[in-house]
Amino acid sequence: MEAKFRLSLLLIILGALAVHGARLENKLENPLPVGAKRSVNCQSMNGICMYGNCPAGTTFCGYDPYTCGSPPGMCCCYD
């Protein structure tokens, strides 16, 4: 029973490391300009980019998939 528990714990840890590695690799492949925040959605319900939906510390909300790395149609917040 303990061996099964240890094996499942090991598999969970390895899975988490694999996911983290994939995310890190994706960030390295798609470098962003300094000051851009990746994929923080600040889109309102009517589809307009609104600064009020951004977290504290940001000064701008806009839609630019090249600059902010957001999916098409999504707004993102900048530092």
From Swiss-Prot:
Recorded GO cellular component terms are: extracellular region; nematocyst
Q: Does the keyword Secreted apply?
A: yes
Q: Which residues form the propeptide?
A: 22-36
Per UniProt, the keywords (alphabetical) are: Cleavage on pair of basic residues, Disulfide bond, Nematocyst, Neurotoxin, Secreted, Signal, Toxin
The stretch of residues making up the signal peptide is 1-21
Q: Which domain of life is it from?
A: Eukaryota
Main localisation, per the record? secreted
Q: Name one GO molecular function term.
A: toxin activity
Give the transmembrane region(s): none
Q: Key word Disulfide bond present in the record?
A: yes
Its annotated compartments are: Secreted; Nematocyst
* Entry PTM: Contains 4 disulfide bonds.
What family is reported? Belongs to the Cnidaria small cysteine-rich protein (SCRiP) family. beta subfamily.
Q: What does this protein do?
A: Induces neurotoxic symptoms on zebrafish. Has also been claimed to be implied in calcification, but tests on homolog proteins suggest that proteins of this family have a neurotoxic function and not a calcification function.
Q: State what protein this is by name.
A: Small cysteine-rich protein 1
Q: Which organism is it from?
A: Orbicella faveolata (Mountainous star coral)
